[in-house]
Amino acid sequence: MTPRQDTPLPIRIGTGERGGTFYTQGLALKAALKRIPHAPDIEVVESSAGVSIENANRLEAGEIDFGFIAAPWVVAAKQGTAPFTRAIDIRVAAPMNLGPNFFIARADSGLRKVSDLRGRRVAVGMKDGGMAPHAEGVFAALGIGPDDLDRVYVDFAEGAEMLATGTVDAQFQCPIPNRVMSELSERILVRVLTYDPPHLDAALKVIPHDRRIIMRKGAVRGLDQDVPQLGVLNLLVTHARLDAATVQRVVGAIILAAADLGRLDPLFAGLAELIETFRGERQAADFGGAGLHPGALRAYQG
């Protein structure tokens, strides 16, 4: 007779490519929640495809319980628009971080602004990932068409290597601090490309739920002034079918662990303030119909 298993299964959280920002945040979540009494055990699940938008499809398939996704792709998943082929009944659990997506070039290049990318080779991320369509939103806002630059579809690490060796002229980077960006800036001097104010305004109109954010002087080696950039809000999401008690338990533990998470991973700095914006129903309507899961609402109102 098979003995009864009393140990609950761990909560599976889908992240991104190994070593990427979502993956390291997932590891920090696992570590922080271990310190919270009665919090569930966490299994960090990397993306086999190296892309975080895969998490929406894995939620639909029941392969994970929660997943990291940037806010614009939460909207796309809920509404079934590109890059998704069908609507997914996704729900928001918690904010994870707000950070800049930004273009970098070698400091010894002639590139200074995003508009200078015309005619250049740019590493924009994986073709089926979240970064590439984000970059396309920027290009569209600036009137940069399909034939105006050469898009190179590679992961963050390969894109950084290509920039270091001069194989590409620029790279679209994810929020800092991240290991790839830190290691690259120690190898070569880089320049963060800036936006003309009308171009940044146009990009904010094109890309839903991005926010203006200030990238502070010294945030990466060689950045010698504060510069406004596109800020992406990254979210922890789940499927509508996941039971409210489980969601409430996970979100409640994240709320309790917010300060600890900020110490474990600088990407979580400011998490407590972001959580406060989720303590009302108005924020829940901000993601294209993908509102807060009922269990998350209970956690915020508890």
Task: Give each language-model segment a name.
Residues 8, 51, 61, 87-88, ...:
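Extracytoplasmic
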Residues 71-73, 81-82, 109, 146-243:
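Pocket-lining segment of extracytoplasmic ligand-binding domains
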Residues 61-98, 108, 178-179:
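Acidic, polar ligand-binding/catalytic clefts
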Residues 154, 158, 165-166, 175-188, ...:
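An extracytoplasmic/periplasmic, membrane-proximal ligand-sensing/linker region
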Residues 43, 48-67:
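Divalent cation-coordinating acidic motifs and surrounding scaffolds
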Residues 1-8:
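Short, low-complexity disordered leader/linker segments with a strong preference
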Residues 121-137, 209-279:
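Ligand-binding clefts/hinges and TM-proximal coupling segments of bilobed small-molecule sensing domains
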